[in-house]
């Protein structure tokens, strides 16, 4: 889900992803090319594509069901994901009470004792 006026961090990964848009309207930037989407459509992110997701509405959230092949890449030890531009630390235009996360779990490469369990 992307809040009104929200966006994801700019990133890339080796696995593809499919986004079935449940509600709202927005767009993606894939390697510098814009692709618009709305409810009922599917957005495809191809392998090795630097991309970012945007909610085009200033008043309504955008929601999507995301389908990825990431587990297969993890199983084959071929997962590579890289953040190109970090998540925004400022509120989206309509979300004045936004508080950024102070910490974020990295479930791909855990560093605590749970990883050894």
What are the functions of these language-model segments?
Residues 18, 41, 51-53:
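Hydrophobic/aromatic beta-strand elements that line small-molecule binding cavities or substrate pockets
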Residues 4, 14-26, 31:
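Glycine- and acidic-residue-biased ligand/ion/polar-headgroup-sensing regions
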Residues 7-13, 36, 54-56:
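Short histidine-centered beta-strand/loop micro-motifs
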Residues 1-12, 47:
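Conserved short histidine dyad/triad with adjacent acidic residue
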Residues 32-48:
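Short acidic-glycine-tyrosine-enriched beta hairpin
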Residues 52-116:
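Double-stranded beta-helix
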Residues 1, 44, 66:
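Conserved beta-strand segments that form the floor/walls of ligand-binding pockets within enzyme
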């Amino acid at each position: 889900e992307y809040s009104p006026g929200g966006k994801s961090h700019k990133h890339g990964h080796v696995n593809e992803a499919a986004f079935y848009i449940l509600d709202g309207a927005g767009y993606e930037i894939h390697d510098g090319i814009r692709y618009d989407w709305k409810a009922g459509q599917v957005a495809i992110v191809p392998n090795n594509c630097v991309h970012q997701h945007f909610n085009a509405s200033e008043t309504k959230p955008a929601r999507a069901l995301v389908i990825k092949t990431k587990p297969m890449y993890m199983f084959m030890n071929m997962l590579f994901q890289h953040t190109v531009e970090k998540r925004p630390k400022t509120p989206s235009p309509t979300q004045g009470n936004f508080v950024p996360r102070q910490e974020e779990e990295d479930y791909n490469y855990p560093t605590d004792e749970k990883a050894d369990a």
